[in-house]
Structure formats: structure tokens, C-alpha cells
């Protein structure tokens, strides 16, 4: 059975498979979808990773812990886990999402991972859900170190400019496309010391700004 293979990849056997099926169901495929599970799973994931970092780095300050957690729970990291599990093969998507390659989209994959975390919590309780998160993240957690590398691009760009007593960057939304639940933002980032205007794209304004800031940093550090 297909779900048996997935459960082996997840290293977890569900008592109630209905929880897993719901976690794999995108809103485009039906009314009983994974949106509520995603909401719950996001909270459990943040707590589980926060707990792991708190215990692993007793000398790290709040800012360092927050930045490391942000790196570990961001969409791109969750999508990497989803691909390791091969979630795209098992997800239930509506015809439109299937046609547009939704099973490859990072936002859909990451939401599914969060929904599965909530499904495990409902199936076996909080301790088991946290245990699974720690198991899935053990390699990533082993690589984490407090420090500047965990700061997001906007923070690093701001600190780069402040350290040189230069004006801060300005961000402006250039374009928003798509429906409310599936939007693409295009944002510009300008700094005084460069004539070029950098354009970032993302599924939220914040992500688009981070993308633009990353481009500016790349330009500044290769000058």
C-alpha cells in the first residue's frame, strides 16, 4: 500500500490513517483538507525546534535562538524535508493544482509537512510529535551554530549599512499577482550607494523583501 511506504519514510506508523490522509489533502482537492492541521502543526514545529535549540545551545541569546529557529522552520527547509519524504507522490491535489505542478511547489510541500506534524500529535500526543520533529531534524540541528549566518538578509543588509553609517534601504511593492491564498509579490530594494534597483519575488511581501535584500548583499560583497 502506498501509505505504508510513506509511513516508513516518515519513521512513524499511524494508528488512525484518516489523520494522515487529511494531512496530505490540499484545499484544492476537497472540503476536509489540511489547512487546520497546518495551523496546528506550525505551532508544534516552532515549539519543538525552539525546545531543541534551547537545550542544545545553553549560552545562545534570544536573538540567536530566534534566528536559528527561523532558518529551521522556514518554507525552504520544510520543502527540503518534504522532498526527502517524497511527499509530492502522496499528496491529494485538485485538477488545477496538479496541472500547474502544485506537488513541486515549496509552499504546498512545506504546508503538508506542518500538517503531518499535527496529524502525529492528534494520533499519538505531543511527546511523540516533538520526538518525530527532532528525529527528522537531527542532521539539520547538528549543523546549526549561533552567529551571523542565521540572520536573515534584511537584517544583514541593515547591519552592513549601519556599520558604515550609510542610509538604510528602501523597499517598495512593485506588483502583486494571484488570488489571496496564492499570491506572488514583486518588491524593489534600493540603497543609496548603488544606482541599480533590485527586484525580489516571493509568496509574501516579507519573502520578496528578503529575496531583494539578498541580491543587494551579493552585489555589495562582490564589489
Curated annotation (Swiss-Prot):
Q: What is its EC number?
A: 3.1.26.3
- Name the catalysed reactions: Endonucleolytic cleavage to 5'-phosphomonoester
Q: Kindly give the SMART domains that the UniProt entry links to this protein.
A: DSRM, RIBOc
Q: Which residues are Mg(2+)-binding?
A: 38, 111, 114
Q: Which residues carry out catalysis?
A: 42, 114
Which is an annotated Pfam family here?
Ribonucleas_3_3
Q: Which UniProt keywords apply?
A: Cytoplasm, Endonuclease, Hydrolase, Magnesium, Metal-binding, mRNA processing, Nuclease, RNA-binding, rRNA processing, rRNA-binding, tRNA processing
- Domain of life here? Bacteria
| Any single GO BP term | rRNA processing
Which cell locations does it reside in? Cytoplasm
Per its UniProt record, the required cofactor names are:
Mg(2+)
Chief subcellular site?
A: cytoplasm
The segment(s) forming the DRBM domain are 152-222
**What GO annotations for molecular function exist for this entry?**
double-stranded RNA binding; metal ion binding; ribonuclease III activity; rRNA binding
InterPro entries hit by this protein: dsRBD_dom, RNase_III, RNase_III_dom, RNase_III_sf
| Cellular-component GO terms for this entry | cytoplasm
Residues covered by the RNase III domain:
3-125
Q: What task does this protein carry out?
A: Digests double-stranded RNA. Involved in the processing of primary rRNA transcript to yield the immediate precursors to the large and small rRNAs (23S and 16S). Processes some mRNAs, and tRNAs when they are encoded in the rRNA operon. Processes pre-crRNA and tracrRNA of type II CRISPR loci if present in the organism.
Query: What protein family does this chain belong to?
Result: Belongs to the ribonuclease III family.
Record's subunit section:
Homodimer.
- State the name under which the record lists this protein: Ribonuclease 3
Which organism is this protein's natural source?
Actinobacillus pleuropneumoniae serotype 5b (strain L20)
